[in-house]
Amino acid sequence: MRAVVQRVSQASVTISDNIVAQIEKGLLVFLGISKIDQVSDISWMADKIVNLRIFEDDQNKMNRSLLDIMGDMIVVSQFTLYGDCRKGRRPSFTDSATPEKAKVLYDNFLSYLKEKYPINVQQGEFQAHMKVNIVNDGPVTLLLDSQKLF
């Protein structure tokens, strides 16, 4: 499971001219699910993201988590995070989970966050063409992988 985590001052997701998710200060998470991911990856990834100390404290040091600031989160499914560009010029997505498997793990990821943490979690629509509007704060962008490949 891979996540691109961006600290934002605001973000929104639009589908067919309708805003389906909108937040102020918080995190925008692009979540990719691979064919080898399992349910056990969900808790590791969700807990890591929510507790990352990437928000500034009173001394302008990154020392506070999303929980500390009671920020918001948008999660957007992003199978292209498993695009392999090593050969040729067109990415291969053979490492991405099937849509059926990815949907189950994506939904479980969202449920885990909403049940465990007292934060506002919003989402994009699985397999939809979305327009994601992001106002990066920092910018702060982190790449996480539950298989610890980085």
From Swiss-Prot:
**Gene Ontology biological process terms in this record:** D-amino acid catabolic process
Q: Does the keyword Hydrolase apply?
A: yes
Q: Tell me if Nucleotide-binding is a UniProt keyword of this record.
A: no
* Class of this enzyme: hydrolase
Localisation: Cytoplasm
Q: What is its main location?
A: cytoplasm
Task: Give the EC number.
Answer: 3.1.1.96
Question: Which Gene3D superfamilies did the record assign?
Answer: D-tyrosyl-tRNA(Tyr) deacylase (3.50.80.10)
Molecular-function GO terms, alphabetical: D-tyrosyl-tRNA(Tyr) deacylase activity; Gly-tRNA(Ala) deacylase activity; Ser(Gly)-tRNA(Ala) hydrolase activity; tRNA binding
Q: What is known of its domains?
A: A Gly-cisPro motif from one monomer fits into the active site of the other monomer to allow specific chiral rejection of L-amino acids.
User: Which NCBIfam families does the protein's record reference?
Assistant: D-aminoacyl-tRNA deacylase
Q: How does it assemble?
A: Homodimer.
**What is the name listed in the Swiss-Prot or TrEMBL entry for this protein?**
D-aminoacyl-tRNA deacylase
- Annotated source species: Petrotoga mobilis (strain DSM 10674 / SJ95)
